[in-house]
């Protein structure tokens, strides 16, 4: 492999100043997300989710499925390592990395389960194969082989055939959504000479709504 120490990327000199901030964290996130989509970033909704469980810290890539005034929503098997970690300690961190725009958004907050009705509505919107897959995988557990997973998939497809209905596969009782309520949202803009812009919105009194400007103060942090 190449020596990673020798790889350099010129981030350009696009500035991100305090006067460039949108009125709320939600509006700013939506603006940058739209820029990432327009720049052709692959899966701009991909985010790293970091947790701290009884067995230590861990991180993985998960897809954002909703963002609104409440916070950021993702779905997962609730017996997975990440879900067990959240049950142990609800404090989490999210990181969106958009290489095509030389930007990052880092979020610190707390995770909680979304209402069951919200989980079931989202599950029904998923493609048939994804709904079956949620039943097939006992996420984070070992399996004797890939063939064992495919055999279970075939059994479940026979049990719940694809009828074209969103109700043909029930929502697993161990599968659900998590809402991350933000305490801090950092907007990072890459610039030349490592003098990047880092504007951080901080909610001093606990998790706050992303669509309300009142609870948030702005800090500029050194890169």
Swiss-Prot record:
PANTHER family cross-referenced by the UniProt entry: PYRIDOXINE-5'-PHOSPHATE OXIDASE, PYRIDOXINE-5-PHOSPHATE OXIDASE
Coiled coil: none
Taxonomic classification: Bacteria, Bacillati, Actinomycetota, Actinomycetes, Kineosporiales
Pathway noted in the entry: Cofactor metabolism; pyridoxal 5'-phosphate salvage; pyridoxal 5'-phosphate from pyridoxamine 5'-phosphate: step 1/1; Cofactor metabolism; pyridoxal 5'-phosphate salvage; pyridoxal 5'-phosphate from pyridoxine 5'-phosphate: step 1/1
Family in the record: Belongs to the pyridoxamine 5'-phosphate oxidase family.
Binding sites annotated in the UniProt record for substrate: 8-11, 65, 122, 126, 130, 194-196
NCBIfam families (alphabetical): pdxH, PRK05679.1
Role according to the record: Catalyzes the oxidation of either pyridoxine 5'-phosphate (PNP) or pyridoxamine 5'-phosphate (PMP) into pyridoxal 5'-phosphate (PLP).
Alphabetized Gene3D superfamilies for the sequence: Electron Transport, Fmn-binding Protein, Chain A (2.30.110.10)
Statement: the UniProt record of this protein carries the keyword Oxidoreductase: yes
One GO term (biological process): pyridoxine biosynthetic process
UniProt superkingdom: Bacteria
EC number: 1.4.3.5
Protein name: Pyridoxine/pyridoxamine 5'-phosphate oxidase
Assigned keywords, A-Z: Flavoprotein, FMN, Oxidoreductase, Pyridoxine biosynthesis
Co-factor: note: Binds 1 FMN per subunit.
Keyword set includes Protein biosynthesis: no
Assembly behavior: Homodimer.
InterPro entries in the record: Pyridox_Oxase (IPR000659), Pyridox_Oxase_CS (IPR019740), Pyridox_Oxase_N (IPR011576), Pyridoxamine_oxidase_dimer_C (IPR019576), Split_barrel_FMN-bd (IPR012349)
Cofactor(s) the protein needs: FMN
The encoding gene: pdxH
Binding sites annotated in the UniProt record for FMN: 60-65, 75-76, 81-82, 104, 139-140, 188, 198
């Amino acid at each position: 492999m190449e020596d990673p120490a020798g790889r350099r990327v010129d981030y350009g000199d696009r500035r991100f100043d305090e006067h460039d901030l949108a009125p709320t964290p939600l509006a700013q996130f939506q603006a940058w997300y739209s820029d990432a989509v327009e720049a052709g970033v692959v899966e701009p909704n991909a985010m790293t989710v970091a947790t701290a469980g009884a067995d230590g810290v861990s991180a993985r890539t998960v897809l954002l499925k909703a963002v609104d005034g409440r916070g950021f929503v993702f779905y997962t098997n609730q017996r997975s390592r990440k879900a067990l970690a959240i049950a142990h300690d609800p404090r989490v961190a999210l990181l969106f990395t958009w290489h095509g725009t030389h930007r990052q958004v880092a979020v610190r907050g707390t995770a909680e389960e979304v209402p069951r009705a919200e989980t079931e509505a989202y599950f029904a919107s998923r493609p048939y194969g994804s709904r079956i897959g949620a039943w097939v995988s006992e996420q984070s557990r070992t399996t004797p082989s890939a063939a064992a997973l495919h055999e279970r998939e075939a059994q479940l497809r026979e049990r719940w055939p694809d009828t074209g209905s969103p109700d043909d596969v029930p929502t697993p009782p161990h599968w659900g959504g998590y809402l991350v309520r933000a305490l801090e949202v950092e907007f990072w803009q890459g610039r030349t000479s490592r003098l990047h812009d880092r504007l951080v919105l901080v909610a001093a009194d606990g998790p706050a709504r992303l669509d309300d400007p009142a609870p948030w103060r702005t800090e500029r942090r050194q890169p």
